[in-house]
Amino acid sequence: MPGNKGIVKRWRDAAPIFAKTGMADELDRLIQPQVTLKSGGYLIINQTEALVAIDVNSGKSTKEHSIEETALATNLEAAEEVARQLRLRDLAGLIVIDFIDMDENRNNRAVEKKLKECLKTDRARIQVGRISHFGLMEMSRQRMRASVLESTMSVCPTCNGTGYVRSPQAVALHLLRSLEEQLTRNSKFDL
């Protein structure tokens, strides 16, 4: 890109730039579903055909005095990380965030405010809903380009993208049923 001529500089170190700067590890983390938070909590990010589901878990995050305080602290930290991950992973479309349930309505509003604040620097068009009584927040984010997962991964030919393959027992039963079906179709063989 000619416009970047003054910005881009040639890498002269013997070590590869991605290894030296730690970018290779960062890129590997972008395709992992789990994102660990500093507090010990974590996010699980699942990108599906219909939507992106983000689950917030407290994990080892128990530094606060009560369950409500732990949930609030983890959710506030998660809101910040969710905004970051949306940009890094180029996640778009319908996004549902399952925050840790909190009893106090003001805490839900604080998490909503934090997420909206963190999303202000995002160039994509975003609509953010409110946290429901189930602890779910719906939002939509404009697709700027294909997500990191879509642009760097291909569908597994074994499971066709489900993430599951048949168990050995299920394979054996499937083979037996198929064999039985074939034998009943061909009357030469006696069962």
Task: Go through each PLM region and give its residues.
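Extended, charged alpha/beta regions that create polyanion-binding interfaces
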Residues: 1-48
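Conserved glycine-centered short motifs in functionally critical loops
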Residues: 37-191
